[in-house]
């Protein structure tokens, strides 16, 4: 087994960079590895139109390390009031690549999200017409639904309907966490894809709850039982082009995670491709990592793959105990623990 792994430079098809003083840190981490990234729009206030997307894009570009060619791919935040014309303007901009459906209350800064899919059907129709992908956080948020069942019920109540109503629409089922989602995406048309995070491949709810509550494993959608983890690993390492890399790296300051009511999100951007390599190596599937990380995503979005390469070496190193996050601190996933793969920084 080789101790070196060279891949076409990957892209991250789902990441949270936050804003303001955090950007120099989060942008440096993502730009270290990835050529492009789909940038989540759930700021306060959210990114609702092309003008706001461009302003956020400029802030990200200004935060890139010197010499970086990292390209942020911007996303609109759908609300009950999103108009078809806003979709058309965003598509015409050339820098907005998708729009995101957050069910209201589903995750961080989603209070302005969609309360009923019926209210955004004209906007979704416009997306289908202009060829803009719809990214969906696939969870119901009703109080009578168990948090571990939110994704499955969303499929039955909403996802099937959207796909049937708009057969030409490209839909990304974001950060899937269940065998049910794997089956749905596998059986759907070629216009339906899904992102999978490193933390959902490496961990299940036992890691978060057994022996004590570990807040830095808490994310939404929440970690599920190990049978779902196995289904995700099967999908990611299958070679099926419908599944591709999306870290959902979502930093929160240490005090906001280690709290009586802690925030949801795992910070993985500092070592994302290294974490995915561990997951794929567990399945003896390192030969499938390039497709998942570097080819399937751009193909789904109709973009060319990157042409430069990165190299990973099998070499133990210790993840930092903490990282700067503006004037605050973020605790990364696997803080203080050993990682098995390391990115060669000088690789081109």
From Swiss-Prot:
Q: What cofactors does the UniProt entry give for this protein?
A: Zn(2+)
What GO biological process terms does the UniProt entry carry, in alphabetical order? Answer: 'de novo' pyrimidine nucleobase biosynthetic process; 'de novo' UMP biosynthetic process
Q: What class of enzyme is it?
A: hydrolase
UniProt: Zn(2+) 2 binding residues: 100, 137, 175
Cofactor: how bound: Binds 2 Zn(2+) ions per subunit.
Q: Does the keyword GTP-binding apply?
A: no
Q: Does the keyword Hydrolase apply?
A: yes
Q: Name one GO molecular function term.
A: zinc ion binding
Keyword terms of this UniProt record? Hydrolase, Metal-binding, Pyrimidine biosynthesis, Zinc
Cite the HAMAP family for this sequence. PyrC_classII
Provide the assembly information.
Homodimer.
Q: What is this protein called?
A: Dihydroorotase
């Amino acid at each position: 087994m080789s101790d070196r792994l060279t891949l076409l430079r990957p892209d991250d098809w789902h990441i949270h960079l936050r804003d303001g003083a955090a950007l120099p840190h989060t942008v440096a981490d993502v730009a270290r590895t990835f050529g492009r990234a789909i940038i989540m729009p759930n700021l306060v206030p959210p990114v609702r139109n092309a003008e706001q997307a461009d302003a956020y894009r400029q802030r990200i570009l200004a935060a890139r390390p010197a010499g970086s060619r990292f390209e942020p791919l911007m996303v609109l935040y759908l609300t009950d009031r999103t108009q078809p014309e806003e979709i058309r303007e965003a598509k015409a901009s050339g820098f907005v690549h998708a729009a995101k459906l957050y069910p209201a209350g589903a995750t961080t800064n989603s209070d302005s999200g969609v309360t009923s899919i019926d209210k955004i059907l004209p906007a979704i129709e416009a997306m289908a017409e202009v060829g803009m992908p719809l990214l969906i956080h696939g969870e119901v948020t009703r109080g009578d639904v168990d948090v571990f069942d939110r994704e499955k019920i969303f499929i039955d109540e909403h996802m099937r309907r959207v796909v049937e109503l708009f057969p030409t629409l490209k839909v990304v089922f974001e950060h899937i966490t269940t065998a049910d989602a794997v089956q749905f995406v596998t059986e759907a048309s070629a216009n339906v894809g899904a992102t999978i995070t490193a933390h959902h491949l490496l961990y299940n709810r036992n890691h978060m709850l057994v022996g004590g509550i570990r807040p830095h494993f808490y994310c939404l959608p929440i970690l599920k039982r190990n049978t779902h983890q196995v289904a995700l690993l099967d999908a990611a390492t299958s070679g099926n082009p419908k599944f591709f890399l999306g870290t959902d790296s979502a930093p929160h300051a240490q005090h906001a995670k280690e709290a009586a009511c802690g925030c949801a999100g795992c910070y993985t951007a500092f070592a994302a491709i290294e974490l995915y390599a561990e997951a794929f190596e567990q399945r003896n599937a390192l030969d499938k990592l390039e497709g998942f990380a570097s080819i399937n995503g751009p193909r789904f979005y109709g973009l060319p793959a990157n042409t430069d390469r990165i190299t990973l070496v099998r070499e133990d190193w210790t993840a930092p105990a903490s990282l700067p996050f503006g004037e605050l601190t973020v605790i990364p996933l696997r803080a203080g623990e050993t990682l098995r793969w390391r990115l060669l920084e000088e690789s081109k």
